[in-house]
Amino acid sequence: MQQVAIYRNLQKNCLSIQSRERENYGKIIGYCKSIFLKRPKFVVREKGRLRVLKEGRKNVHAFVVGRCPDLNLWSWQDRDIKMGGNPTTKVFYDPYKYSTFVDKDGNPVYKARAVLVNTNYIQADITKEN
C-alpha cells in the first residue's frame, strides 16, 4: 500500500495523486476521477485557506491523505456505497465556510476508517473503531 495525498485539480477537472512516500514525497504520480483510501486523514493547511479568503482565489491547501491499496484506479457512479458493511457519510470542504472538512451537519471530520474520494464529493466511513 502506498501513502498518498489526494486533492481536487481544478485545472484538469480530476483528482491529483501526490506521493507521500519518502523517495517521491510531493511528486504527482497520477490523476483519476475517484480513488479509495484506507485510514485517511483530512488535512487543511490554514495558511493556504487564509490566502484563499484574502485573494478570493483557490489554491491547493486541502488534502485527503491515506493508504491506497491499489493504484490501478477505477471510477464509481454517484451512488451510496457501503465500505466494509458500514454506512458512509458525505464529507465536504469549503474554505469560505469552514476551516476543516465537515459532514452534512457541519461537524468537523479529521479522519475516517476508509474513504472514496470523487471529483464531486467524498464518501467516508467515519464509524468509531472498537
List each model region and its residues:
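Cysteine-centric segments in proteins
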Residues: Y121-A124
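Acidic, low-complexity, intrinsically disordered interaction modules
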Residues: Q18-V117
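Short aromatic-glycine-enriched beta-strand elements
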Residues: N13-S16
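Structural detector for short beta-strands of small beta-barrel domains
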Residues: Q2-N9
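Short acidic DE-rich linear segments
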Residues: T127-N130
